[in-house]
UniProtKB/Swiss-Prot annotation:
Designated name of the protein: Small ribosomal subunit protein bS16
GO molecular function, one term: structural constituent of ribosome
Alphabetical list of PANTHER family matching this protein: 30S RIBOSOMAL PROTEIN S16, SMALL RIBOSOMAL SUBUNIT PROTEIN BS16M
Bias-annotated ranges (Basic and acidic residues): 98-109
Listed GO biological process terms: translation
GO annotations of cellular component type: cytoplasm; small ribosomal subunit
Keywords for this protein: Ribonucleoprotein, Ribosomal protein
Organism encoding this protein: Synechococcus sp. (strain CC9902)
InterPro entries in the cross-refs: Ribosomal_bS16, Ribosomal_bS16_CS, Ribosomal_bS16_dom_sf
Start-end of Low complexity biased regions: 110-130
One Pfam family here: Ribosomal_S16
HAMAP family from the UniProt entry: Ribosomal_bS16 (MF_00385)
């Protein structure tokens, strides 16, 4: 299977990357099948060979997560909703709903306790008068 991935080059702590097409079993910095672009994370400079990338994607090449993000920014592929994002949002929504239910329950209990307390002194006053 062909992967679109980043190949690291540059000095220590000053890495730059080439966007390459390579076999999925090859090493990260091994010989690529084709160089498709360039990415410098320090300056955010990105150069993409759009025709070659579209051709590789048409042949079934799979981009890695970082490369997918770069291609989305470049407008070559549509943004995708990643499952982890939707799962995280679902968990947050469920947590908010549970907190709201608990707050409503606590408020109802406090209101019932206040009503019971208000009735208790009235009952004591009637008993002492009678």
């Amino acid at each position: 299977m062909i992967k679109l991935r980043l190949k690291r080059f540059g000095k220590k702590r000053e890495a730059s990357f080439r966007l390459v097409a390579c076999n999925s079993t090859s090493r990260r910095d091994g010989r690529p099948l084709q160089e498709l672009g360039f990415y410098n994370p320090r300056t955010k400079e990105t150069r993409l060979d759009t025709e070659a990338i579209r051709e590789r994607l048409g042949q079934g090449a799979q981009p890695t997560d970082i490369v997918r993000t770069l291609l989305e920014r470049g407008g070559l592929i549509e943004k995708t909703v990643r499952p982890s994002v939707t799962v995280g949002q679902a968990k947050q929504t469920a947590k908010r709903e549970a907190a709201a239910k608990q707050a409503a329950k606590d408020a109802a209990e406090a209101k019932a306790a206040a009503a019971a307390e208000a009735e208790a002194p009235a009952a004591d006053a009637e008993a002492s008068e009678g």
